């Protein structure tokens, strides 16, 4: 949006125009050379005249923005490069999300942490540029924001556990699982919240669903963290009081790493690799 004007997918139409605009917005801190933009848009595809193709694409983008938004010069040309006009302020939801997470992480005030992480989680609507994940720069940003989202969710869930806000854990985990259905810990949080809410039948159903999801998507059999949750379900079935949620969560961490080689097909390997990238990004590796 710009003032009262909206530039949506219908007006842009071309995927390449959308990618060009998003690249200019997300990299607006510096001028982008023709080579940088060409590599970002076409990667290793052979383009006869990348400078000419980029010039044509930029012309189309400027024409659309001028027609539907404003005569302002959003993108300027300088010495063989293109740059976003810094006089035009930009606010991206992704960057607002990042700011919330950073404020929460930097604070020691529980109320501030809760408020900012809750705002961040509410703002996150899914993978960043999910239709452009065939481009390395989009994948990098998407992985970065998604890892930040998972960290926000799990930190928030741990705070809710300490505050005994089990219904909030249930709502939070349901929302998070819509964004990432193959994260085992998210399934554990959800099932543990159902256990504390004495929703045994639903918890058992969700356990079975979670095991099947992880098996189908990743080829993982008998996931260790979910097995600990299953023990609590069995206790409930026998009429035994469930263990404290804090203890269940602590025990989800495996004592020993699995040893040996794991064989899987390429689709499973690709998904595991993607998850490892997310994990390493969270850990700053």
Positions of predicted regions on the chain:
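Intrinsically disordered, low-complexity protein-interaction/activation regions
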Residues: 1-171
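Active-site-flanking beta-strand signature of metal-NTP-handling nucleotidyl enzymes
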Residues: 97, 250-251, 284-285
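An N-terminal, helix-rich hydrophobic module
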Residues: 105-128, 144-240
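Amphipathic HAMP/coiled-coil signal-transducing linker helices
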Residues: 245-266
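Short regulatory alpha-helical coupling segments
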Residues: 264-284
């Amino acid at each position: 949006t710009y003032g009262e004007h909206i530039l949506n997918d219908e007006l842009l139409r071309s995927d390449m125009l959308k990618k060009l605009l998003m690249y200019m917005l997300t990299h607006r801190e510096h001028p982008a050379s023709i080579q940088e933009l060409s590599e970002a848009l076409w990667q290793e595809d052979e383009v006869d005249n990348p400078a000419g193709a980029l010039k044509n694409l930029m012309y189309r983008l400027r024409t659309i923005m001028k027609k539907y938004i404003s005569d302002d010069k959003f993108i300027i040309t300088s010495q063989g490069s293109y740059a976003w006009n810094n006089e035009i302020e930009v606010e991206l939801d992704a960057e607002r999300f990042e700011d919330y997470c950073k404020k929460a992480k930097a604070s020691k005030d529980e109320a501030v942490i809760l408020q900012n992480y809750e705002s961040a989680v509410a703002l996150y609507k899914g993978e960043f540029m999910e239709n452009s994940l065939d481009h390395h720069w989009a994948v990098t940003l998407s992985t970065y924001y998604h890892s930040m989202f998972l960290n926000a969710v799990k930190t928030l869930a741990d705070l809710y556990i300490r505050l005994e806000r089990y219904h909030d854990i249930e709502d939070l985990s349901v929302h998070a699982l819509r964004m990432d259905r193959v994260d085992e810990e998210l399934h554990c949080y959800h099932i543990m919240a159902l256990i504390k809410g004495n929703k045994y039948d639903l918890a058992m159903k969700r356990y079975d669903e979670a095991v099947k999801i992880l098996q189908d998507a990743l080829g993982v059999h008998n996931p260790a963290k979910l097995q600990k949750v299953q023990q609590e379900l069995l206790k409930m079935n026998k009429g035994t009081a469930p263990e404290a949620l804090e203890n269940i969560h602590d025990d989800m961490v495996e004592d020993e790493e699995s040893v040996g080689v794991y064989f899987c097909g390429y689709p499973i390997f690709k998904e595991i690799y993607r998850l490892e990238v997310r994990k390493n990004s969270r850990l700053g590796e």
